[in-house]
Amino acid sequence: VSRGLGDVYKRQFLASYQFLKGLEKGTMDITREHLPNKSSITEIKIENFYLKEMPVLTQILSVASFTGALDILEGKGVFFKEAFLKYELVNDELRILECYGTGPSLGFVLEGKIRKDDFVSLNGSLAPANTINNIVREIPVVGKILTGKKGDGIFGASFKIKGKDNLKVEVNPIKTLTPRFIQRFLKILKK
């Protein structure tokens, strides 16, 4: 197991994936476990960072009509308290096992893969912070204390990112969040 991989590796990792462009500040911890057959499992935890001027996220936010988050992204950036990525590398194909991010403005979950030929195929869900508050609010006793007064229903956007050089983004802007998405966020928030 390789723990605390160095800054050079971290910069190379961020530079090698087009959809990660725009990550600023924060701290990153990377752990890699080498497995047989030239495969590995890597865990990346990033804390207290901003996403800024990220074309794929800009497109998702604008189609999903998350205008407040879009304004922040185009300004100082969208702040995330924590993001976690666990992936398996098998035959030079990156398979996402778990990926999420939480912050005061947005939360997301992501799954998919990046093939050996650099073709990206990702699916995810994006929720504004008030949606996350509504999820937390449903936790018996503690939820209402933590989130204050009740807001509107639980809605978010789902998206797909596909392609090689020019990533194509599809967004379903009015998607009721699935129980799986809600369960993942409750699990994340309980950590």
Model regions and ranges:
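Extended terminal
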Residues: Y17-L23, D29-K38, T42, Q59-I60, ...
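Gram-negative outer-membrane beta-barrel proteins
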Residues: Y50-K52, I132
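Short secondary-structure boundary/capping segments
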Residues: V8, T58-L61
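Short edge-strand/loop segments of extracellular domains
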Residues: E47
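Single conserved hydrophobic/aromatic residue that forms the stacking wall/gate
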Residues: V1-L5, Y9
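Short alpha-helical segments and helix-capping/turn motifs at coil-helix boundaries
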Residues: S2, M28-D29
